[in-house]
C-alpha cells in the first residue's frame, strides 16, 4: 500500500490533512444517513488526495477526472485496490458530466441518485507532468514545445508561437503571464519564427533571456516562468474551463455538499474568488434588514478569504508555498434555483438528496445548471457595474 503522504508514485499531495478536514463533514453526514458519498476529483493527477479520501472515508466513492490519458491510466491501476469505489474519466474537468452520460458503474449510479457530496480541484500543472521533459511544460530542460495536458488533441505551444499574430501573442503573455515585456517578446517571437519555426523549449528560453533586460531578470524568479505559464494556459484553455466548472460542479452538490479549490497562481485564484462570491451573494437589494423570499444565496463560504499552507507544510512540500484554498458549501435550494433537473428522493433530518429524472444525465440537469450559471454571471455583471460607479 502506498504511503498516504508520499505514495509510491513519489507525489506529495499539498495540504492533504486540511483537504480531508474540509471534505469530512459532508462525507460523514452522508455516511450517517446510509447514503453513499460521491466525491468528484476534477484534477486526479497522481491520485494522492483521492487515495486519502478513499482510505479515510470507507463509505466514499470517487469520480476521478483527468485530461492526461497516460497519467489517468497509471493512477487508475494504482487505485485498483479500491475496486468499485473509484471510477476514472478521461475528460476536461468542465465536461465531467457529459462524459458520464453513457457510463454504467456503481459510482455513477450513486452520483445519479444522490448528486455530489464534494467537488475537489487541485489546479494547475502537476509536478509529474513538469518532470516529463517530452511534455514541454518545463523551461529548465530542452524539450518539444507541446504543453498539452491531453496529448491526443488540440494545438501545441509551438502552434501558438508559429501562428498567432504579434497582437495575440502580446495579449496572452500579458493576460496569462503578467509579463511586463509582453510586447518586445511577441515581436521577437514573430521575428525568429520567420527564420525557423518554433519547436523546442531551450530556443525559447534563450530568446527570453536575450529580450528581457538584465536588471529585470534579477527579480521575480526565472525569467521564462511567466511566458511558459501563459502558453500553457492558452494551449489548455485552463481559465475558460475553470470559469465553467465552478457553477457547474456546485449545481450537483446536495445539501451540505462542499466544493474545494486549490489555486497556485493569481489568475486562477481571482476566478475562483469571483465565481464563489457570485454564488454566495444575496439577491436582496442592499439596505434591507432580511433576505427577501427566494433571494437568499444557496451557498456560503467555508473558508474566510483564501487559506494558505502553514510553515510545516511549506517545509515538507515546496509546491505548497503558492497555494490558495477556497471552499463553499450548499445550504439550500431557492425556488428559482431548484435541485438541477431532479425530484426529491430521500429526506433525513436536515439533509435531502435527489435523483435525476429519466433520460440522459446531461439533459436531466441542464435546466438547473444553466440557471445557476446564469445567476452567477448576473451577479458578476452587477458587481462590475457597482464597482465601475464607485
UniProtKB/Swiss-Prot annotation:
Keywords attached to this entry: Cytoplasm, Methyltransferase, rRNA processing, S-adenosyl-L-methionine, Transferase
Keyword Cytoplasm attached: yes
Ranges for region Disordered: 282-390
GO CC terms, sorted: cytoplasm
Record field: compositional bias (Polar residues): 348-358
EC number: 2.1.1.199
GO molecular function, one term: rRNA (cytosine-N4-)-methyltransferase activity
Cytoplasm is among the record's keywords: yes
Locations listed in the record: Cytoplasm
Chief place where the protein resides: cytoplasm
Reactions listed under catalytic activity: cytidine(1402) in 16S rRNA + S-adenosyl-L-methionine = N(4)-methylcytidine(1402) in 16S rRNA + S-adenosyl-L-homocysteine + H(+)
Coiled coil: none
Entries under SUPFAM superfamilies matching the protein: Putative methyltransferase TM0872, insert domain, S-adenosyl-L-methionine-dependent methyltransferases
Residue stretches of biased makeup (Basic and acidic residues): 305-316, 360-372, 381-390
Positions annotated to bind S-adenosyl-L-methionine: 47-49, 66, 93, 122, 129
A biological-process GO annotation: rRNA base methylation
Role description: Specifically methylates the N4 position of cytidine in position 1402 (C1402) of 16S rRNA.
Family in the record: Belongs to the methyltransferase superfamily. RsmH family.
Matching HAMAP family: 16SrRNA_methyltr_H
Name of the featured protein: Ribosomal RNA small subunit methyltransferase H
The organism of origin for this protein: Corynebacterium kroppenstedtii (strain DSM 44385 / JCM 11950 / CIP 105744 / CCUG 35717)
Gene, per the UniProt record: rsmH
Amino acid at each position: 500500500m502506498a504511503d498516504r503522504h508520499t505514495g509510491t508514485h513519489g507525489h506529495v499531495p499539498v495540504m492533504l490533512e486540511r483537504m480531508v478536514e474540509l471534505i469530512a463533514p459532508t462525507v460523514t453526514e452522508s455516511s450517517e444517513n446510509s447514503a453513499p458519498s460521491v466525491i468528484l476529483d476534477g484534477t486526479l493527477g497522481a491520485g494522492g488526495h483521492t487515495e486519502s479520501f478513499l482510505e479515510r472515508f470507507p463509505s466514499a466513492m470517487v469520480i476521478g477526472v483527468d485530461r492526461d490519458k497516460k497519467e489517468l491510466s497509471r493512477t487508475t491501476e494504482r487505485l485498483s485496490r479500491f475496486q468499485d469505489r473509484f471510477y476514472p474519466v478521461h475528460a476536461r474537468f468542465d465536461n465531467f458530466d457529459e462524459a458520464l452520460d453513457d457510463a454504467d458503474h456503481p459510482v455513477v449510479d450513486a452520483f445519479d441518485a444522490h448528486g455530489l457530496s464534494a467537488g475537489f480541484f487541485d489546479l494547475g500543472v502537476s509536478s509529474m507532468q513538469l518532470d516529463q521533459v517530452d511534455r514541454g511544460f518545463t523551461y529548465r530542460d530542452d524539450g518539444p514545445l507541446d504543453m498539452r495536458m491531453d496529448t491526443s488533441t488540440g494545438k501545441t505551444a509551438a502552434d501558438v508561437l508559429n501562428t498567432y499574430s504579434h497582437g495575440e501573442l502580446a495579449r496572452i503573455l500579458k493576460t496569462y503571464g503578467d509579463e511586463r515585456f509582453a510586447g518586445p517578446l511577441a515581436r521577437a517571437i514573430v521575428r525568429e519564427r520567420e527564420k525557423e519555426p518554433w519547436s523546442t523549449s531551450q530556443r525559447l528560453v534563450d530568446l527570453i533571456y536575450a529580450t528581457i533586460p538584465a536588471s529585470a531578470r534579477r527579480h521575480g524568479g526565472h525569467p521564462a516562468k511567466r511566458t511558459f505559464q501563459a502558453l500553457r494556459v492558452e494551449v489548455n484553455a485552463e481559465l475558460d474551463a475553470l470559469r465553467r466548472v465552478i457553477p457547474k460542479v456546485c449545481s450537483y452538490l446536495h445539501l451540505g455538499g462542499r466544493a474545494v479549490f486549490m489555486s497556485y497562481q493569481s489568475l486562477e485564484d481571482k476566478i475562483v474568488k469571483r465565481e464563489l462570491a457570485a454564488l454566495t451573494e444575496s439577491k436582496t437589494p442592499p439596505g434591507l434588514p432580511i433576505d427577501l423570499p427566494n433571494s437568499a444565496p444557496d451557498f456560503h463560504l467555508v473558508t474566510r478569504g483564501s487559506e494558505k499552507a502553514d510553515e510545516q507544510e511549506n517545509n515538507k512540500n515546496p509546491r505548497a508555498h503558492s497555494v490558495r484554498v477556497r471552499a463553499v458549501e450548499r445550504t439550500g435550494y431557492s425556488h428559482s434555483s431548484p435541485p438541477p433537473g431532479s425530484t426529491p428522493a430521500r429526506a433525513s433530518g436536515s439533509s435531502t438528496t435527489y435523483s435525476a429524472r429519466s433520460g440522459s444525465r446531461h439533459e436531466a440537469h441542464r435546466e438547473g445548471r444553466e440557471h445557476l450559471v446564469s445567476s452567477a454571471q448576473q451577479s458578476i455583471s452587477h458587481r462590475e457595474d457597482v464597482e465601475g460607479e464607485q
